[in-house]
């Protein structure tokens, strides 16, 4: 029966056009990856069919021997990648081959700079997949039939990569997908038996599905040593070119670094090498194998809530799902890898994974394995760990709140900038800080501000710098939230130097204590006058010894929300209970001394407001009425210039 072809021409999604153009130019120097990408996709399609066949064994009836097959033809300059996997319907072909169904695609494309080397790294992180075919081909034909449908429901998709594709219905005898690459004139090297076999063993040896090529036929010799005629009608025989054994099932000592690296590229579609990996087999009450990777670069969508994350899940070597999120906590969403369990059911679902005791045990063990891997890297390979931290540090900072059971381990992995060097780079561990603590010091001091410069130049640090106390400088948006989950580390409690009383009493002698108390008593009338002026904005005005150069600073209560966190939540539209800071003033500052003798109440009020507004600005805050601040400042300058 003739098939109604329903042939139509459609346009690529705008992002596909951009990606195709950039990819062809940026990845040309690494063009052989096209075969790895297409074999990887074919392997995934076979894995998906194997999974679907668990519930419907009839899907395998016509051809139970799952495989990927590579063919080539020197005369027509073509290479074919053929699989007998799950295949695609017409709608799936249009969606999968004509659009990029990834959230954040537009944002990713905006990151591309035109620098070929940088762009090639970004595109590699994004994952080129099927579109890599156009690096070596000027035309690509895809013939595909969904498993379980009739032969006349197959489709043919054709494009030259310029912006459009045609799609039509065809008849196809077998399920699965056949991709025909019509190679560019300069890419004939790939229509070669030896070249293709070499690429399969180089990039795809670890894939658990057999990757087959036609078995070479060597003519038999007659008694006189001449080749016998070859039967041209004999059906070709195929042989597996790869080892076709799941890499994670092999003993670690039998797997080379190159094989681990290529397997990472296969599962992550990232063609940069991983920073670290851990391969482990667990036997006993629970039996499972895991292979976990730490990427070398953060993905472009790391901060996208909808980013695909999680491990590839296999049950007894049968592929179950991608992005199984249940096996690692959200702050480890950058980890790639595979987990293969003998204890889960083949019909496991995402919902079941959320409520399974075996999964909970595996999650706990895998989380500790990742933390141990990072801990060893931090101890033994600090340069590599610093690279990791620079890429993923802000995600690890989610850990103390997410994972209370491993809070101490996570705290040991954190890195900060500090007054030890004042550099913005986050290189200081809490262990480093404790090692440099002064005798008698029992607190780890830190400050949080909206920028590194605001933090390191904060008036709150003045007395601490003078007395030689190191202070951690925090300026990432997540930092204040993270610190709210950290109470102590190795017996040392944390103190935000902008909150409550800065207790350096243990480091003061009796004479200093007495002098401070006398100053505070002498200052009381001035402080009361200032409080009367600023009553609507401050909870109180106190004398302080935490300042040495600045006239004033703002301090919140020990248990109150920090000013930066308060601003963030208010900007997000959250209603918060009213809370006023305390203004602390430096009794030794000339401005404060001048105010003490000021008899003009209007000028005194202007000076009090200016101190409050300067303190607000110095800790990164914004003024409610900048124009009035400028007016006050100008008025005082004029008065002083007379």
UniProtKB/Swiss-Prot annotation:
The subcellular location is: Cytoplasm
Signal peptide positions are: none
Q: Which domain of life is it from?
A: Bacteria
- Where in the chain are disulfide-linked cysteines found? none
User: InterPro entries per the record?
Assistant: HATPase_C_sf, Heat_shock_protein_90_CS, HSP90_C, Hsp90_fam, Hsp90_N, Ribosomal_Su5_D2-typ_SF
Identify the keywords attached in UniProt to this record, alphabetized.
ATP-binding, Chaperone, Cytoplasm, Nucleotide-binding, Stress response
Ranges for region C: 568-642
Please give the Gene Ontology molecular function terms for this protein. Answer: ATP binding; ATP hydrolysis activity; ATP-dependent protein folding chaperone; unfolded protein binding
Q: Which Pfam families match?
A: HATPase_c_3, HSP90
Per the record, the similarity remark reads: Belongs to the heat shock protein 90 family.
**Job description of the protein:** Molecular chaperone. Has ATPase activity.
Oligomeric form and interacting partners = Homodimer.
What is the name of this protein? Answer: Chaperone protein HtpG
Species this protein is from = Marinomonas sp. (strain MWYL1)
Instruction: Identify the taxonomic lineage of the organism of origin.
Output: Bacteria, Pseudomonadati, Pseudomonadota, Gammaproteobacteria, Oceanospirillales
């Amino acid at each position: 029966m003739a098939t109604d072809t329903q042939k139509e021409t459609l346009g690529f999604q705008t992002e596909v056009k951009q990606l195709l153009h950039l990819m062809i130019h940026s990845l040309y120097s690494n063009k052989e990856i096209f075969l790895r990408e297409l074999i990887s996709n074919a392997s995934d399609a076979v894995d998906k069919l194997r999974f679907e066949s668990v519930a419907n064994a009839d899907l395998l009836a016509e051809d139970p021997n799952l495989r990927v097959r590579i063919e080539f033809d020197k005369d027509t300059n073509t290479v074919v990648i053929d699989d007998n996997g799950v295949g695609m319907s017409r709608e799936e072909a249009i969606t999968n081959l004509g659009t990029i169904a990834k959230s954040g695609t537009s944002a990713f494309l905006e990151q591309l700079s035109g620098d070929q080397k940088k762009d090639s790294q970004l595109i590699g992180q994004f994952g080129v997949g099927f579109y890599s075919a156009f690096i070596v081909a000027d035309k690509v034909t895809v013939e595909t039939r969904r498993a379980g449908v009739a032969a006349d429901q197959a489709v043919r998709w054709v494009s030259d990569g310029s912006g459009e594709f045609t799609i039509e219905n065809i008849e196809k005898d077998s399920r699965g997908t056949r991709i025909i690459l019509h190679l560019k004139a300069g890419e004939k090297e790939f229509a070669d038996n030896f070249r293709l076999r070499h690429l399969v063993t180089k990039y795809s040896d670890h894939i658990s599905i057999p990757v087959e090529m036609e078995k070479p036929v060597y003519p038999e010799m007659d008694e006189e040593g001449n080749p016998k005629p070859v039967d041209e009608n004999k059906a070709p025989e195929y042989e597996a070119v790869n080892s076709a054994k799941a890499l994670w099932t092999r003993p670690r000592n039998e797997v080379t670094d190159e094989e681990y690296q290529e397997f990472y590229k296969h599962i992550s579609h990232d063609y940069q090498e991983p920073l670290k990996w851990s391969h482990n087999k667990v036997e006993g009450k629970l039996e499972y194998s895991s292979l976990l990777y730490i990427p070398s670069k953060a993905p472009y969508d790391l901060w996208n809530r909808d980013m695909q994350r999680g491990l590839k899940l296999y049950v007894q070597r049968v592929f179950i799902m991608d992005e199984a999120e249940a096996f690692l906590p959200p702050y480890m969403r950058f980890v790639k890898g595979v987990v293969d369990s003998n204890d889960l059911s083949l019909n496991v679902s995402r919902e079941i994974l959320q409520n399974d005791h075996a999964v909970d045990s595996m999650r706990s063990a895998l989380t500790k394995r990742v933390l141990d891997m990072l801990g060893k890297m931090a101890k033994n390979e600090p340069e590599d760990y610093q690279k990791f931290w620079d890429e993923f540090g802000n995600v690890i900072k989610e850990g103390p709140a997410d994972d209370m059971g491993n809070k101490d381990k996570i705290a040991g992995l954190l890195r900060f900038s500090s007054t030890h060097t004042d550099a913005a780079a986050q290189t200081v561990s809490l262990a480093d800080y404790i090692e440099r603590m002064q005798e008698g010091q029992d607190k780890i001091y830190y400050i949080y501000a909206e920028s590194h410069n605001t933090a390191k130049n904060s008036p709150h640090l003045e007395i601490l710098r003078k007395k030689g106390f190191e202070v951690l400088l925090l300026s990432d948006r997540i930092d204040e939230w993270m610190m709210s989950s950290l109470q102590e580390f190795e017996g040392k409690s944390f103190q935000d130097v902008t909150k409550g009383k800065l207790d350096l009493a243990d480091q003061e002698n009796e004479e200093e204590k007495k002098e401070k108390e006398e100053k505070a008593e002498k200052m009381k009338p001035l402080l009361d006058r200032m409080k009367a002026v600023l009553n609507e904005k401050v909870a109180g005005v106190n004398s302080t010894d935490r300042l040495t150069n600045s006239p004033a600073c703002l301090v919140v209560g020990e248990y109150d929300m920090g000013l930066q966190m308060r601003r963030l939540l208010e900007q997000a539209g959250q209603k918060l209970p009213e809370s006023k800071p305390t203004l602390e003033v430096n009794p030794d500052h000339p401005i404060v001394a001048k105010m003490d003798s000021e008899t003009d109440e209007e000028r005194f009020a202007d000076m009090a407001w200016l101190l409050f507004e300067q303190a607000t600005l110095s800790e990164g805050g914004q003024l409610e009425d900048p124009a009035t601040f400028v007016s006050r400042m100008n008025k005082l300058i004029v008065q002083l210039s007379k």
